[in-house]
Amino acid sequence: MRTVCSSSPLPMRRRQSCAPALLKRSQAEPGNGALRRQRMLLQRAPICTIDAFCLDLLRKHFQALDIPPDFSPADPGSVELLRVSALSETLENAYRDPDFCAFADLYGKGRTDRAAGETILHVYDFLRALPDYDKKLDEFLAPWQDENGFAAICWHDLLLAEAARSARAAGELFRAALADCPGDREQELADAEEKKTPSAREKAKNAVLEKYTDAQERLDKAAALLGRVEQLAVAGEWTPLYDLLTPYVLGMEELPGLKGMKKRLNGEHKKVIRTRADEGAALFAQILELIPCSEEEAEADRRAAEPRLRALFAAVRDFDARFSAKKRDRKLLEFSDFEHQALRLLRDPDGTPTALCGVIRQNYAAVMVDEYQDTNALQDALYRCLASPAGDDLFLVGDLKQSIYRFRQADPSIFREKLDSWPALPGGTARPRPAEGTPGTDAMLALDANFRSAPQVVKGINFLFERLMSPELGDTAYGDGQRLVCGAPGEY
């Protein structure tokens, strides 16, 4: 069995947490030889971080790679100096390309090339979390060269999807602005009845009714507009959506909301009404920025962007080569180098497992990955190499709600994809082990029991997060499988 953890203090804690449990079980069953054997094997069990596993693999098989046998892990300080040096050389070479100059002019500010250099580093760092990242550059560039035009690139669908989400949220805000505050109108009508003369009372009541009728009509019109925006965005209708929004961009149509009349609302909930209307209007303004031009103009931009992107990707490749050479000259490897070189040992360029991979697999009855929500695509490829071809000996444990390492290129969507597609484990923990030679199936078992908190605490947490978390905010909906369940209610 191999257990892979994501950060350095975890392996020792995992080993220490298993030992007392095994001791307790073996004392309760003194005749159980299997438990005694597991206690002895625990001290030699390969529980480690993915970086430690890869480093050990490289030290044992360096001769199969183009790395020096006496390489050493690079410290952050020395690596940063090499990055700066490699980037400086890369920029000096890149500026000989007119297309890169055009890219730098587009992103740069003033006479500095800082933005261009930072973009090269951002793209490089992103790519290094992917397997076979050099091929990915060609894949990323291909849509910009596609004859199908603007609709072929990812931004077409992403912008429309974001416009649909914003329209849905804005529509809900406009609909709720007055709906949740029905008492305000009645209170103002009651105040109007306090006027001294019948004519004054009638005038005041008419003013109140006119004001709230006007507000409701504006909000209904805004909600209907946002509903149409959402409908077109979901359908992928860029041109009709742009045509619908253009009059608002040009000032030919009044922007949705309560502009000009918010000060006339004097009820108890006036701040709530104003806030919701303002937030809905702000979301509509964002939609105008998401769909800023016609499809023809966007296609012209795509054609202009393609040579600049090609020049940027060429600069990224050049930086990669220079940076790698500088590390190689000093016999240094970064943690990401460990993982990429380990993948070369375990998998051929076409994705076929190597002979060495088959040998290493034989050492493990199971591969268990903890903190899986903090995995990136490169690490996931390594786990797949270590597992059997059927993947029935690979166990992934994680919690999307605890994903906090995006800044280190962790990709929670890898875990979310499995949560969304894998069925629940039939029979739960009581499911019998499949017969030898029977192909396994991917399945998910929710470990949602909380043994640390009282029922009142669990209930309060669930109440908050059911309202706060969504796939867009928090990477997952707080529903079945994510909601906490009190594991020991009788102890409180």
Could you tell me what each predicted segment is?
Residues 34-41, 280-285, 421-440, 488-492:
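Short, conserved catalytic or adaptor-binding loops enriched in Gly and charged residues
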